[in-house]
Curated annotation (Swiss-Prot):
GO MF, one annotated term: ion channel inhibitor activity
Domain-related comment: The presence of a 'disulfide through disulfide knot' structurally defines this protein as a knottin.
Record-linked InterPro entries: Huwentoxin-1
Name listed for the protein in its UniProt record: Lambda-theraphotoxin-Ec2b
Primary role: Insect-selective neurotoxin that potently blocks insect calcium-activated potassium (BKCa) channels (Slo-type) in cockroach dorsal unpaired median (DUM) neurons (IC(50)=25.3 nM). This occurs in the absence of any shifts in the voltage dependence of activation. May interact with the turret and/or loop region of the external entrance to the channel and does not project deeply into the pore of the channel. In vivo, does not show toxicity in mice after intracerebroventricular injection of up to 25 pmol/g (1.8 ug/20 g mouse).
GO cellular component: extracellular region
Disulphide-bridged cysteine pairs: 2-16, 9-21, 15-25
Species of the source: Eucratoscelus constrictus
Reported tissue expression: Expressed by the venom gland.
Subcellular location(s) of the protein: Secreted
One family name in Pfam for this protein: Toxin_12
Amino acid sequence: YCQKFLWTCDTERKCCEDMVCELWCKYKE
């Protein structure tokens, strides 16, 4: 899932506050 307070974009968290990372997170969720 996506946690916007996390500034990471890895296979564990799949998220960060960067737009590209958010999109990546949403598609790979």
